[in-house]
UniProtKB/Swiss-Prot annotation:
Organism of derivation: Pseudarthrobacter chlorophenolicus (strain ATCC 700700 / DSM 12829 / CIP 107037 / JCM 12360 / KCTC 9906 / NCIMB 13794 / A6)
Function: Specifically methylates the N4 position of cytidine in position 1402 (C1402) of 16S rRNA.
An example Gene Ontology molecular-function term: rRNA (cytosine-N4-)-methyltransferase activity
Cell location: Cytoplasm
NCBIfam families (alphabetical): 16S rRNA (cytosine(1402)-N(4))-methyltransferase RsmH (TIGR00006)
Residues reported to bind S-adenosyl-L-methionine: G48, G49, H50, D67, L101, D115, Q122
One GO BP annotation of this record: rRNA base methylation
Name of encoding gene: rsmH
Top class in the EC scheme: transferase
A cellular-component GO term for this protein: cytoplasm
E.C. designation(s): 2.1.1.199
Protein name: Ribosomal RNA small subunit methyltransferase H
UniProt entry keywords in alphabetical sequence: Cytoplasm, Methyltransferase, rRNA processing, S-adenosyl-L-methionine, Transferase
Length: 330
């Protein structure tokens, strides 16, 4: 008899799990040296794989898990139940870190992990509409309790707006053709499923483009997902907020999955790792000194073994930094 497929939470292999933990660990040590119990934020909790590994390894660690996806939060809660005395799980978007910490009475943290993009749970749950590989309602919301859906976007945005988001968020060179086709098709019948959208995209993207760019709908789906969830706007607010929350010696680790995400992460971390002294200033005052020390040379990527275990990790790019000076005054 064939075994039934394991639930997504059991199949899930956390991306770069050991490397993430090893990068965060010195931040926990720094807290202990200051006589404090270490506190870490998993800002994109997902199914809790990274968090579970950290809680198992560090018995004194307190975890704050944040996720906008209520289903993921519930599954992670079950997974992390043995550690419930050392966890706070919060339904929020990760740019709300300052509010979450204020509500919990936490003033600073020892580390923060961000694993960006769409989760395995969201990709595997057909009805969520994130995947172009099977037909499903055209939704794509990470938080299904609020906000516009992907169907709302493709059925209501004008052609110029569609071109803009598909080109900007999807980096799709056929954005004009795709937007034009979407507008024409919805005039006959509004889009309701992913399959309908994939069919229209296939009709205008040259077959040869798939050889180098993957599935013809890949970039458009990425663009719609980013638009629906305001992912890059959230990220631009979240990374600075995360850095501001770090205690001395605390560390931030971020995994991104496409160049738009990585560009934002790189900009913030590198910007905060440089002197802010005005050009030509004769001395570097304390408040001008770098706040962060970069811990990774460029980006780190998964090994071939890790990719074999989890093919979705192939595009992961990791950056990390450590706080070496108190936050800048506003």
């Amino acid at each position: 008899m064939n075994e039934q497929p394991k639930p997504t939470s059991e199949r899930h292999v956390p991306v770069l799990r050991d490397r993430c933990i090893n990068l965060l660990a010195p931040g926990f040590d720094a807290a202990r040296q200051q006589g404090k119990a270490p506190i870490v934020i998993d800002a994109t909790l997902g199914m809790g794989g990274h968090s579970e590994a950290m809680l198992q390894r560090f018995p004194d660690l307190h975890l704050i898990g944040i996720d906008r996806d209520e289903e993921a939060l519930a599954l992670a809660g079950e997974r992390l139940a043995p550690f419930s005395a050392r966890t706070d799980l919060v339904h929020a978007v990760y740019d709300e870190i300052p509010e979450v910490l204020a509500d919990l009475g936490v003033t600073e943290i020892s580390g923060i992990l961000m694993d960006l993009g769409v989760s395995s749970l969201q990709l595997d749950e057909r009805e969520r509409g994130f995947a172009y590989s099977f037909d499903a309602p055209l939704d794509m919301r990470m938080d299904t309790s609020r906000g516009q859906t992907a169907a709302d976007v493709v059925n209501t945005y004008n052609e110029e707006e569609l071109v803009r988001i598909i080109r900007k968020w999807g980096e799709e060179k056929f954005a004009g053709r795709i937007a034009n086709r979407i507008v024409a098709a919805r005039g006959e019948k509004p889009f309701t499923t992913t399959g309908e959208l994939v069919e229209q995209i296939r009709s205008v993207v040259p077959a040869g483009a798939a050889k180098s760019g993957g599935h013809p709908a890949k970039r458009t789906f990425q663009a719609l997902r980013i638009e629906v969830n305001e992912e890059l706007d959230v990220l631009e607010r979240a990374v600075p907020a995360a850095v501001d929350a770090l205690a001395m010696g605390g560390r931030i680790v971020v995994m991104s999955y496409h160049s738009l995400e990585d560009k934002i992460v790189k900009s913030v971390l590198q910007g905060r790792s440089k002197s802010s002294a005005p050009l030509g200033f004769p001395v570097e005052l304390e408040e001008h000194k770098p706040e962060l020390k970069i811990l990774t040379k460029g980006t780190e990527v998964p090994t071939a073994v890790e990719i074999a275990e989890n093919p979705r990790a192939a595009s992961a790019r990791l950056r990390a930094a450590e706080r070496i000076r108190a936050r800048r005054a506003a």
